[in-house]
Amino acid sequence: MKPDIHPVYRTVVFHDTSANEYVKVGSTIKTKREIELDGVTYPYVTIDVSSKSHPFYTGKQKTFDSESSAARFQKRFGHFIGAKRG
């Protein structure tokens, strides 16, 4: 490998602000902020959504209407189909 062309790989703390959870992950992201966790200073990045807060991973998914698109169309516009012209 050539020297001085690869980004620095280091442990970074990602803070999920919606769940107030901290996750330490190896990353090459550049940050200006730092945080101290367990007596060690790490680069710090805030994020809005992670596996700690996303509904798919937490099991708090919303269920959507399972009615087919054809049934919805028929309900909305079915009265036009049988109407007489004239």
From Swiss-Prot:
Q: Any keyword Membrane?
A: no
* Superkingdom to which the source organism belongs: Bacteria
**Per the record, GO CC terms?**
ribonucleoprotein complex; ribosome
From its record, what is one biological process in GO terms? Answer: translation
Q: Name one Pfam family in it.
A: Ribosomal_L31
Q: How does it assemble?
A: Part of the 50S ribosomal subunit.
| Protein name (database record) | Large ribosomal subunit protein bL31B
